[in-house]
Curated annotation (Swiss-Prot):
It is found in: Cytoplasm, P-body. GO terms for molecular function: zinc ion binding. Residues 12-31, 129-150 are annotated as: Disordered. InterPro entries: Zf-FLZ_dom. Residues 12-28 have a biased composition (Low complexity). The keyword Transferase does not apply. Belongs to the FLZ family. This is FCS-Like Zinc finger 15. Keywords: Cytoplasm, Metal-binding, Zinc, Zinc-finger. The gene is FLZ15.
Length: 150
C-alpha cells in the first residue's frame, strides 16, 4: 500500500499546486510544460513519466541537417529509405555489411598502429634516457656531489 499512497500523495500535491497557482496567479516555472502521469506497476513500485513540451520542428530540423543517415560513411553512396542501414559506433551509417566491415577493419588497424607507435616511443625514450644507460657509463653514487666516502 506504500506505493499506492505515494501515487495518491503525488496526485493530491499536483492538484493542490494547481489550485494554489490558480488562486495566487503565480506560476511555478518548473511546472510549466511538464506533464506528470504516475502509473502504479505494483504496490511497491511506481513509474512517473514526464513529458516536456518542446518545439518538435527544431528537433526535426536538427536531425535533417546532420545528414549522417543520408550517405554511407565509407563509400558515400546515398542511403535509400527502403534499404537497410548498417550502423557502427552509433553515428556512422553504412550501405552494406561489407562497407561496415571494411571500416571496422580500418579502425582496428589504426588502433593497432597507434598502440605500436606509442610502444615504440616508450622504448625509444627508455633507451635515450641517461638513467637507463649501461652500467659502465654510470658514475658511482659515492663520487657524485653530495655523496660521502667511507
Amino acid at each position: 500500500m506504500v506505493g499506492l499512497s505515494i501515487v495518491l500523495e503525488m496526485t493530491n500535491n499536483n492538484n493542490n499546486n494547481n489550485n494554489n497557482n490558480n488562486n495566487n496567479n503565480n506560476k511555478n516555472p518548473l511546472s510549466e510544460g511538464v506533464l506528470i502521469s504516475p502509473k502504479v506497476v505494483n504496490k511497491a513500485n511506481i513509474i512517473v513519466t514526464t513529458a516536456v513540451t518542446t518545439d518538435t520542428t527544431n528537433l526535426r530540423r536538427c536531425y535533417q541537417d546532420s545528414g549522417f543517415l543520408e550517405h554511407c560513411f565509407l563509400c558515400r553512396r546515398k542511403l535509400l529509405p527502403a534499404k537497410d542501414i548498417y550502423m557502427y559506433k552509433g553515428d556512422r551509417a553504412f550501405c552494406s555489411v561489407e562497407c561496415r566491415s571494411k571500416q571496422m577493419i580500418m579502425d582496428e588497424e589504426e588502433s593497432l598502429r597507434r598502440e605500436y607507435c606509442s610502444l615504440m616511443d616508450v622504448k625509444k625514450k627508455k633507451f635515450d634516457s641517461p638513467a637507463t644507460a649501461p652500467s659502465r657509463y654510470r658514475r658511482d653514487p659515492r663520487n657524485q656531489a653530495g655523496g660521502f666516502a667511507y
